[in-house]
Every structure is written in C-alpha cells, then in structure tokens.
C-alpha cells in the first residue's frame, strides 16, 4: 500500500507528522481527498476538520481554523492558523468561547470585534464537531 507523508502544523507547533493513505480537508471549493502521488496543488482551507487515514486504517481527526494546503507527490502539508487534535479539545472551554462569541455577535459591537467573534465562533463550532465525531467513533 502506498502512502504519502502528512505534516499538520500551526503557528504554535507541529501537530502531526506521519504516513497516510488519505488526507481529507475542506478547501475553498469543497472537500478535497489527497492520496499518494496526487498532483501538486496549493489551496486555501476553510475552518473545519482534517481527517488523516493511517496505513493501518485508523482515522485521526484534527480541527483547524483555516489555513493553506500544499500537495506534492510525496508529501501533503497543512499549514493551519490554529490546529488541534480532536481528543485534545477541552469541551467546556470551547463551549464558553462559543457562547462569548455569540453574545458579541448578538450585541453587534465594533466591526473588528464582530469579525473576531465570527472567527472564534467558527473555530468553536469546528472543534465541537470534531469532538462529536470522535465520540461517535469511540462508541463503535
């Protein structure tokens, strides 16, 4: 079985480095599936999840707040603004951040404050979705 090296990095740290048989992420135009020997490409990533399928069939879920995906024939790199492994998500903190962002949006503060709240809300939703998917996987 052929593999492709996958690197997922954020501004703070390297989140994942390893071999994969498939990497799935959400680009600006929709969902992308990157397999070994994929044609080179660069695209923006929307906030969402990145799913890495390892050679043993395990699926690893990551939540990202957006970024860039670079694909070369032997390596796929996710350069995320922020990224976190699904199992590392602190649900209570994420829910609190989501509620705070919703409060700011409801009060319609300054334009910059609203833009930041929208970004934080998008990140919180993505993290909660990744956490829910992880829980469903663990139940099976």
UniProtKB/Swiss-Prot annotation:
It comes from the Bacteria. The keyword Ion transport applies. Pfam families: ATP-synt_DE, ATP-synt_DE_N. Coiled coil: none annotated. Its main location: membrane. It is found in: Cell membrane. The keyword DNA damage does not apply. One of its GO terms (cellular component) is plasma membrane. Keywords: ATP synthesis, Cell membrane, CF(1), Hydrogen ion transport, Ion transport, Membrane, Transport. CDD domains: F1-ATPase_delta. Produces ATP from ADP in the presence of a proton gradient across the membrane. F-type ATPases have 2 components, CF(1) - the catalytic core - and CF(0) - the membrane proton channel. CF(1) has five subunits: alpha(3), beta(3), gamma(1), delta(1), epsilon(1). CF(0) has three main subunits: a, b and c. Belongs to the ATPase epsilon chain family. This is ATP synthase epsilon chain. It comes from Stenotrophomonas maltophilia (strain K279a).
């Amino acid at each position: 079985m052929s593999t492709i090296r996958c690197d997922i990095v954020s501004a703070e740290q390297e989140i994942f480095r390893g071999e994969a048989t498939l990497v799935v992420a959400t680009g600006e135009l929709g969902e992308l599936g990157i397999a070994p020997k994929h044609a080179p490409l660069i695209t923006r990533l929307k906030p969402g999840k990145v799913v890495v399928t390892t050679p043993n069939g395990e699926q690893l879920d990551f939540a990202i707040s957006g970024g860039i995906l670079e694909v070369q024939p032997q390596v796929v790199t996710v350069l995320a603004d922020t990224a976190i492994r699904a199992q590392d998500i602190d649900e209570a903190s994420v829910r609190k951040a989501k509620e705070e962002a919703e409060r700011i949006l409801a009060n319609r503060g300054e334009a910059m404050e609203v833009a930041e709240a929208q970004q934080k809300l998008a990140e919180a939703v993505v993290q909660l979705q990744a956490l829910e998917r992880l829980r469903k996987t663990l139940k099976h």
